[in-house]
Amino acid sequence: LFGGVRFDTTADIPIPASLIDQVIGQEHAVDVIKKAATQRRHVMMIGSPGTGKSMLAKAMSELLPKEDMQDIMVYPNQEDNNNPIIRVVPAGRGKEIVAHHKEDAKRQASSRNTLLIVLVIGVLGISFISGQLLMGIIAVAFLFMAFRSLIPKESVMVPKLIVSNKPDSFAPFVDATGSHAGALLGDVRHDPFQSGGLETPAHDRVEAGAIHRAHKGVLFIDEINSLEYQSQQSLLTALQEGVFPITGQSERSSGAMVRTEPVPCRFLM
């Protein structure tokens, strides 16, 4: 017998389905968390290690409405490759849109390859008949180069899903404790090629940060003073504006030239 509950093993003890109801001995904190989730307010928790701060923060994410969840996507910008376009869609739609674009890209690639094969066969056939086989081979080489450099790759047009949520899942809970600037604010990966037809499109190198993945959810940071001062300033800006663009965090990286449109990051911290 313990706490008015009789049991033989711990398996006999009923566990509440909701995480907030599993918190023991923090009645006032539980009440504050419930009110903050309802009113969408930030919470500062002060306490010794092991008192349930992270558990309360995670429980808060379960109290937020599921209907508001969204996916965030990055599209290529035809006018300015270094300024990718941001689009927000309902949760679950992002994967469907990406799959649809990939199918279109496959069909376009198949059509392009078929056209290239027909042209190669035609050029080689004509050069063989006319006795100019060497010129035909040179013409085929130029064809390959033209198709590779002048005709854009279909993959360039496929948007990238940087924040994905399930329609029936809880609001996201993201622990950003001790994160460096790129992990917290987002980053753009370095492209070692950058030209020659081997480069990776700018929008495909964009990576969401913790503040973006926590959009419509909870961002938890333990010991916020462990963050760099510049990261703290940027975090304050994101809190105030509710949006924050993603750019390369390293000055020596090619990603430093890329800056997206403002990305939604309306989180509770």
Predicted regions span which residues?
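Conserved ASCE/P-loop NTPase catalytic core
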Residues: L1-M269
